Design a protein with these regions (language model features):
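Peripheral, non-catalytic segments that deliver or gate enzyme domains
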Residues: 1-210
Length: 210
């Protein structure tokens, strides 16, 4: 019973992580509420009944989960959402040992933290933390206190619509005068160049290998 969930492939491409709800009781398929989402790992070629439970939060039945397995295979990042507001909690698990616990990185719903990617223990997010028009923020999971956070790309006069890490660079998609403006930065936040368009328009969906 998969709803409100994408999938995130493991680095070895042998399976993927996803969120699902318990199967409703007989006769309640189209009546029961969406409660108690859980995160599972599905190995390709095996029945869904064999999927491994990765995370659940029964004390918070209204929470939903979006999964991101990092490209280097080291971490599973879970974005926790509640309702429709762009305010998220963030959890992560070190995948080097199956017994490692799920750790709270952001333990409140006060701001947006949209996961972009990672460089080792540094996790990159598009965020409105102290930045109403959004910034790119980096958090070291080994030193997660907010005083150690780094604003990689500060808030600009334009609104940061989306961001991604592609080919070792940050691609920042801004909305300026109802049209797209694309700027490229290195992972330390140094400006590299602006992508010029032949005319007025919009562009989005910048992603690929980090």
């Amino acid at each position: 019973w998969i709803k409100f969930s994408g999938i995130s492939w493991s680095a070895d491409n042998k399976g993927f992580y996803y969120g699902r709800y318990d199967e409703p009781q007989k006769g309640e398929k189209f009546q029961s509420l969406n409660k108690d989402m859980k995160v599972y790992y599905h190995r390709v070629g095996t029945p869904q009944n064999d999927d491994k439970l990765i995370h659940a939060s029964p004390e918070n039945p209204d929470w939903g989960f979006q999964t991101n397995a990092t490209e280097d295979g080291k971490y599973l990042v879970i974005t926790v959402w509640k309702g429709t507001a762009d305010k998220y909690r963030i959890k992560f698990k070190d995948l080097s040992d199956t017994d490692n616990p799920m750790v709270d990185l952001i333990d409140n719903f006060e701001n947006e933290y949209s996961f972009i990617g990672n460089e080792g223990p540094w996790f990159y997010f598009k965020s409105d933390w102290k930045a109403p028009k959004k910034c790119v923020l980096a958090i070291n999971v080994n030193h997660p206190e907010s005083e150690n956070w780094k604003v990689i790309v500060p808030q600009a006069s334009e609104t940061l619509d989306s961001a991604g890490i592609v080919g070792g660079k940050l691609v920042a998609d801004y909305l300026k005068d109802a049209k797209t403006q694309i700027k490229i930065f290195d992972l330390e936040g140094r400006f590299v160049r602006e992508v010029k368009f032949p005319g007025i328009g919009t562009a989005s969906g910048f992603g690929g290998k980090q």
